[in-house]
């Protein structure tokens, strides 16, 4: 398995393309100059395209991925109804979902042969919309509205329209600020990192289209932490055993172990990392974690080790200015 790591740096308007080998070593293979401040990125389900959101001219760009080395070639673009904060796709590669924090909306862009061709639906009134996350069964879109302390739930129709489910939302504790999410591989649990109180909620999907319950909330910060809380990102290993979340103020990654059924998280430790770590990701083997420092302009690679899933630094690399997004593609 070959793996390519893509790093989005909006301040220098670049995507750095790296090869990740089996020993956790990165080799720079390409630097792409992007026509705008590039932030969120996602790889298409068939691994043929990288979709990126840019500002200040709000667009989604599609880059064709070379199958041999992961190199990028521009392919197409489509306008968006707001500044892109988060980007994702459905599991069949039919639609791109874009959450916009500033516009307070989530949009659906249709794909034809992998290329974006236009927005087919927009839902407004999502104050602080910070991500759009498709459920494992490809039916429900989870959309955290950070400023409203709620996660809105939409059914995705065959033509890409979003229909509010019943119930139409789940709510967090007041002032939590739900932000980013991941799903357990067993499809029975979802995990949401809350930006404003730096906590992680565990949601049990008893019925993913209606009966959803928060079964655990864990503080992700050290006991003696007294500064402003400012959580950012969350990811889980492919085997579902280890979960990670980061806080930008502390420049810290919190390490969690996950119970066998996915229902319980346990804090295992803390890893100091790049300054104001905004984004990170786990590779497809579950052996490495790559973290980007928005203020350090560097990325670090960590090996995931032991039963606890603790992080051991393997290497550190300079990238563009203000790196914010990390995507790993296996090919």
Curated annotation (Swiss-Prot):
<comment type="similarity">
    <text>Belongs to the cycloisomerase 2 family.</text>
</comment>
<keyword id="KW-0313">Glucose metabolism</keyword>
<dbReference type="InterPro" id="IPR015943">
    <property type="entry name" value="WD40/YVTN_repeat-like_dom_sf"/>
</dbReference>
<comment type="pathway">
    <text>Carbohydrate degradation; pentose phosphate pathway; D-ribulose 5-phosphate from D-glucose 6-phosphate (oxidative stage): step 2/3.</text>
</comment>
<keyword id="KW-0007">Acetylation</keyword>
<dbReference type="InterPro" id="IPR050282">
    <property type="entry name" value="Cycloisomerase_2"/>
</dbReference>
<keyword id="KW-0119">Carbohydrate metabolism</keyword>
<dbReference type="GO" id="GO:0017057">
    <property type="term" value="F:6-phosphogluconolactonase activity"/>
</dbReference>
<dbReference type="GO" id="GO:0006006">
    <property type="term" value="P:glucose metabolic process"/>
</dbReference>
<dbReference type="InterPro" id="IPR011045">
    <property type="entry name" value="N2O_reductase_N"/>
</dbReference>
<protein>
    <recommendedName>
        <fullName>6-phosphogluconolactonase</fullName>
        <ecNumber>3.1.1.31</ecNumber>
    </recommendedName>
</protein>
<dbReference type="Pfam" id="PF10282">
    <property type="entry name" value="Lactonase"/>
</dbReference>
<feature type="modified residue" description="N6-acetyllysine">
    <location>
        <position position="287"/>
    </location>
</feature>
<dbReference type="InterPro" id="IPR019405">
    <property type="entry name" value="Lactonase_7-beta_prop"/>
</dbReference>
<dbReference type="GO" id="GO:0009051">
    <property type="term" value="P:pentose-phosphate shunt, oxidative branch"/>
</dbReference>
<keyword id="KW-0378">Hydrolase</keyword>
<dbReference type="InterPro" id="IPR022528">
    <property type="entry name" value="6-phosphogluconolactonase_YbhE"/>
</dbReference>
<dbReference type="GO" id="GO:0005829">
    <property type="term" value="C:cytosol"/>
</dbReference>
<comment type="function">
    <text>Catalyzes the hydrolysis of 6-phosphogluconolactone to 6-phosphogluconate.</text>
</comment>
